[in-house]
Amino acid sequence: MNKTAIALLALLASSASLAATPWQKITQPVPGSAQSIGSFSNGCIVGADTLPIQSEHYQVMRTDLRRYFGHPDLVMFIQRLSSQVSNLGMGTVLIGDMGMPAGGRFNGGHASHQTGLDVDIFLQLPKTRWTSAQLLRPQALDLVSRDGKHVVPTLWKPEIFSLIKLAAQDKDVTRIFVNPAIKQQLCLDAGTDRDWLRKVRPWFQHRAHMHVRLRCPADSLECEDQPLPPPGDGCGAELQSWFEPPKPGTTKPEKKTPPPLPPSCQALLDEHVI
């Protein structure tokens, strides 16, 4: 196993060992009609659905962490996408983190995934279903070269291109985050059908999975959507800027103090956490 794969596994494992946040003390969805509240990186959810663990089209990883909750729209998206993938004979979709029962802030590994509208999906589609042991300790497949400038040709498969494209074409999806090298390969492979590329955004890490984000549901009145991605396919200067060396004097941004919770989320926390 190479160093990058080991690091990815360590990151998965480390998030479970950090101190719990108050949101992790809520072990069941909060009753009520489904409402995503706040922003993706500062919010919560009422009336979350549980993604069924058993499915012929997908498998859920790390069920011991209990991060398989989300807005009903997210559950339906996962079922819709995995059914499409299965019908095309592409393999089994591997589902990573969604959100916690009431959403909210994680103890590590994610800044977002707080409103029940985000899901991580591995960029591999096994033809043979994984065992319980494999699902509990998943082996991330790093698709990006060590220098970060391109995908590994022997690991990049047409099925992965199709998986990302199918997700991006879904009506409820607003963004998909992938590594810049993966976005670059999508740009090369896309041909003339390029409208969907607008939703695929380059971001740090994301070498072995895609992070799919849905738009705010119309009836979630306190949900804060992001602005739409810039027009175009995103394959030009913006993408190339990710491969340029840091400018002299560039320093890492200081870690910010988390902003106050939306009032509805604070009230939910006060009511359900002793």
From Swiss-Prot:
Needed co-factor(s)? Zn(2+)
Q: Kindly indicate whether the keyword Transport belongs to this entry.
A: no
Q: Where along this sequence does the record place binding of Zn(2+) 2?
A: D147, H150
Molecular function terms, GO-annotated: metal ion binding; metalloendopeptidase activity; serine-type endopeptidase activity
An example GO biological process term is:
proteolysis
> Which top class of enzyme applies to this chain?
hydrolase
Decide whether keyword Protease is in the record.
yes
An example Gene Ontology CC term for this record: outer membrane-bounded periplasmic space
Pfam families named among the record's database cross-references: Peptidase_M74
Chief subcellular location equals periplasm
Q: What does this protein's record comment on cofactor binding?
A: Binds 2 Zn(2+) ions per subunit. Zn(2+) ion 1 is bound in the active site. Zn(2+) ion 2 is bound at the dimer interface by residues from both subunits.
Report the leader peptide range: 1-19
> According to its UniProt entry, what is the function of this protein?
Murein endopeptidase that cleaves the D-alanyl-meso-2,6-diamino-pimelyl amide bond that connects peptidoglycan strands. Likely plays a role in the removal of murein from the sacculus.
Instruction: Kindly give the HAMAP family that the UniProt entry links to this protein.
Output: MepA (MF_01623)
What's the protein name? Penicillin-insensitive murein endopeptidase
Q: Which lineage is the organism of this entry classified under, starting from the top rank? A: Bacteria, Pseudomonadati, Pseudomonadota, Gammaproteobacteria, Enterobacterales
